[in-house]
């Protein structure tokens, strides 16, 4: 993985001052992580709990001298959300549930409708890339796949979206 000098300096600071590093992480990622988890759970109380748990785990990692970054936090948050959904015995824990909720709320309905037509893995990749603005390497780290796989899936998902939009325009 290629690490910028800025990221390397941040990692060194994390090891030296875990409290300061945690504050830095919270400033940078707390709101974004809350939004991501809310899109998965649709439960504000659960989101607050899981964000707190994710940052607690980040602090524990920092105290052990291990670096923590945004993709790591998202991975922890996502895993906590999946665990929460399993505990609640929800039948559908995949990303399609999230997309249905988003479409029902309005906003960019065409985009959400188009995302619903994609396989849930592709829709999740597009969400992380387009909405949360993560780089392909970060998404790969979060999902445990190779960056090349992320790029390939993003390309295919964009092609499917393009075809959906073209079909919608042809019908109009």
Where are these regions (language model features)?
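N-terminal module of bacterial RNA polymerase sigma factors
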Residues: 1-35, 39, 172
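Internal acidic/polar
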Residues: 2-8, 83, 90-115, 135
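Sigma70-family region 2
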Residues: 15, 52-69, 87-89, 164
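Conserved RNAP core-binding helix
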Residues: 26, 34, 44-61
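Hydrophobic-face residues of short alpha-helical interaction/recognition segments
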Residues: 33, 37, 73, 77-85
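Arg/Lys-rich amphipathic alpha helix in sigma70-family domain 2
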Residues: 64, 68, 78-95, 104, ...
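DNA-recognition helix of helix-turn-helix
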Residues: 78, 82, 143-167
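A short pre-motif secondary-structure segment
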Residues: 125-126
